[in-house]
Amino acid sequence: MVAALHAGKAVTIAPQSMTLTTQQAADLLGVSRPTVVRLIKSGELAAERIGNRHRLVLDDVLAYREARRQRQYDALAESAMDIDADEDPEVICEQLREARRVVAARRRTERRRA
């Protein structure tokens, strides 16, 4: 946190037991409010319904954010490849195309499950 402050980045401090509205959760996750509602409906994010409003526990939102970040890092690591400077550019382009195909196919199957 101190490093972020020194770098001039914004830092948010909030108690860990705080509950959030869907808009606050969306702001924290960097997504739209409808996306948060969709995540709640799909069961990816836990929420309590109070009247016609959803309330999310800050710990749950932070845990989801960390899990999402880890999935992104894993996807990057999985799609990374070593490129030799002596390798033919056409071979490299074909390897990149194949990596994109694999990632796109994985996304399609994940969307079908959801």
Curated annotation (Swiss-Prot):
InterPro entries: DNA-bd_dom_put_sf (IPR009061), HTH_17 (IPR041657), SinI_DNA-bd (IPR010093). This is Uncharacterized protein Mb2337. It comes from the Bacteria. GO terms for molecular function: DNA binding. The lineage of its organism: Bacteria, Bacillati, Actinomycetota, Actinomycetes, Mycobacteriales. Pfam families: HTH_17. SUPFAM superfamilies: Putative DNA-binding domain (SSF46955). Coiled coil: none annotated.
